[in-house]
Amino acid sequence: MAKKIVGFVKLQVPAGKANPSPPIGPALGQRGLNIMEFCKAFNAQTQGVEPGLPLPVVITAYADKSFTFIIKTPPAVTLIKKAIKLDKGSATPHTAKVGKITRAQLEEIAKTKMKDMTAADLDAAVRTIAGSARSMGVTVEGVV
């Protein structure tokens, strides 16, 4: 018989830097899950990833206090900022532009994000990522 799911916990955790402090500790503690076990497993799975890169993680909590988790790809905004070496997006995105991104850079980001996106093909994924870039105040080149 399958385990009974009692809930899901969605968090963004820096790669290799999971520790029991907030927000991880309280989120897992209220479900009765072993916080240190999660931290050790998460840090072990994210060893090959750039340290500190925020990764969305979905933790499935079961009735017997066990859990499983799925690590997703980094948020598009983080990948865009990394690609064009930007600290933060524009405060007024449609008036003040903070940088430029090319189609080649967008395709690279779209290939990374593709497994977590619902886009039908690479071109649709590129357009989605381009929309995220525009809403950050980044000028998009090569995408209509």
Swiss-Prot record:
Keyword Ribonucleoprotein: yes
Keyword RNA-binding appears in the UniProt entry: yes
A GO molecular-function annotation: structural constituent of ribosome
CDD domains: Ribosomal_L11
PTM description: One or more lysine residues are methylated.
Source taxon at top rank: Bacteria
Alphabetical keyword list: Methylation, Ribonucleoprotein, Ribosomal protein, RNA-binding, rRNA-binding
GO biological process entries: translation
One annotated Gene Ontology cellular component of this protein: cytosolic large ribosomal subunit
Protein family per UniProt: Belongs to the universal ribosomal protein uL11 family.
Known function: Forms part of the ribosomal stalk which helps the ribosome interact with GTP-bound translation factors.
Record's subunit section: Part of the ribosomal stalk of the 50S ribosomal subunit. Interacts with L10 and the large rRNA to form the base of the stalk. L10 forms an elongated spine to which L12 dimers bind in a sequential fashion forming a multimeric L10(L12)X complex.
PANTHER family named in the record: 60S RIBOSOMAL PROTEIN L12, LARGE RIBOSOMAL SUBUNIT PROTEIN UL11M
Protein name, as recorded: Large ribosomal subunit protein uL11
The organism of origin for this protein: Polaromonas sp. (strain JS666 / ATCC BAA-500)
